[in-house]
């Protein structure tokens, strides 16, 4: 029997009350310093994989011991996952990196039925977990002591901008024929739908992260890790099938007017991207500050359409959880989901499809979202999300000099 890896966090907690530290998540007050110490319990002589399928972390939060259970988020990437960027002279360069042994996990806190966790273990521990109804973030501290991490409540991150942040969608998808409402109790694994998601990063965001493509890719992977967890409630499985970074220049006119940017991005996807890479839905991440309070926009009820199965999202926060929720929101519109009303509920939290982003982040879809999503799926039956792809999609005879790294090359 394979023994589960046990990792113990030895907590050296030094709350810096009233002081501030600058982390990737922003300026943070009142945090604790923790020192992860890995203790394995694998059989003697066993080869330890780089990233185990299951892990446990013991730590203290606010002086109380907790046990964090983590499982690798299998299926996070499609089998033909690709990454594309552009050389300074504009050549398209596409690679197919190995991603099976990745470092992204979902989890829960022991003895807390409502807890969730989304953690990257790539370079230290980075992510968030919900404990007793409160959201905590964890990330490595940039100190000479490489083992030091910070743990802090989401509410202790200083807000850069108190202005409201909203989705720009105003219309709803309406079914023209009455259909039987879906309920979670009568859905089975046969109803599962699969979305192969492609994410494009504009040149402004590339420059925002100082041209660090690795940092951008990690951020995107962490976001999709969060989205995949959220969509499980809707019986929808998300796999990231590709990332394209406009490292040389923008391929469309990215402008503050979100509707025009969305229209241009949809046309580009239809005429360019789909000819190079098969996928079900594409989202554009941009550093452009959209007009007004808008931070995202998408077409409603358009999943699988060559132009309209798209959305545009402003990279509006250093906290990847908030941007991930925004992308999950816009993808929800593509699936026919409207904004929540006061009668919608997701267990007392602000829900993903709220028209305005909440200062208390939520990873939960409401009961209204569930019904609307399956109304759309059963009425429109979008074909592209019926089955997950089981084979590599873009395989050709290896040819050197075309800047495309094919399978086998």
Curated annotation (Swiss-Prot):
First-level EC class: hydrolase
Superkingdom of the organism of origin: Eukaryota
Keywords associated with the record: Calcium, Disulfide bond, Hemostasis impairing toxin, Hydrolase, Metal-binding, Metalloprotease, Protease, Secreted, Signal, Toxin, Zinc, Zymogen
Record GO terms (molecular function): metal ion binding; metalloendopeptidase activity; toxin activity
Gene3D superfamilies: Collagenase (Catalytic Domain) (3.40.390.10)
Propeptide feature ranges: 21-189, 390-409
Cofactor binding annotation: Binds 1 zinc ion per subunit.
Tissue specificity annotation: Expressed by the venom gland.
Signal sequence range: 1-20
Residues that hold Zn(2+) according to the record: 329, 333, 339
Record: residues binding Ca(2+) 1: 196, 280, 384, 387
Disulfide partners: 304-384, 344-368, 346-351
Chief localisation class: secreted
GO terms under biological process: proteolysis
Transmembrane listed as a keyword: no
Coiled-coil stretches: none
Localization terms from the record: Secreted
Pfam families assigned: Pep_M12B_propep (PF01562), Reprolysin (PF01421)
Peptidase M12B domain location: 193-389
Any GO CC annotation of this UniProt entry: extracellular region
CDD domains cross-referenced by the UniProt entry: ZnMc_adamalysin_II_like (cd04269)
Function: Snake venom metalloproteinase that impairs hemostasis in the envenomed animal.
Subunit structure: Monomer.
Name of the protein: Snake venom metalloproteinase BITM02A
Taxonomic source organism: Bothrops insularis (Golden lancehead)
Taxonomic path: Eukaryota, Metazoa, Chordata, Craniata, Vertebrata
